[in-house]
C-alpha cells in the first residue's frame, strides 16, 4: 500500500474509532492486489472489494476512475477517501476523476479533517502558498497526503484475522459502467515508449593527505572549468 493511500485509510479508521463509521476499501488490479486488501483488513477495515476483470485491463486513469466510480454507485457512502496519487504514475488524477464521475464536491491534498456535525466537514488543504481551511458537505471525495497522519501498525491478531475475512471480487457485471469506458477501450492515454533510466557509474575514492587532497580538488575543478 502506497504512503498516501495508507494515510487515507488511517483517516477513515480514525472516523471509525470516533464515530463508529463503516470502512470499505476498494482497489483495482491483478490477483496480487489481494495482499493490499488483506493489509487493510489487518489495520481495521470492515469490508474489502477487489475490482478484477479482463475488461479492466490496460486502463489509464480515466478508465480506472470510471470502474471505481461504478463500484461506488453500488454502495452507500458518506465520504470517499483516496490517496493523493500512486507511486508509479504520480498523476494524482484518479481521485478527482472519481468525484467528477459521481458529480460530488472534492477537496485534494488534505492534511486534516474534522467533523462539524450534520453533513459538514472542515478540512485542512495543503497548497504551495500555505494551508487552507475549507468547509465541505458530504457526500464528497477527498484525497490525502502521506503527511496527514501516522498510520497505525497492523496487530498480530489483525494479521491473523485478515486471512479469515472475505475479499469480494467484483467484475464488469457488478458495476454500472459501459464497457466502452473501461480498460484499454476506455483509455484515451497511449504509451508509445517506456524506458529505464540508466544507472550512474560509481565515483572514484581517493585516500590522500590533506595537502594532496586540496591540490587534487583544485585540479579537478579546473578540468571542469569551474575555477
Name every feature range the model reports, one short phrase each:
Residues 1-227:
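N-terminal glycine-rich FAD/FM-binding segment characteristic of electron-transfer flavoproteins
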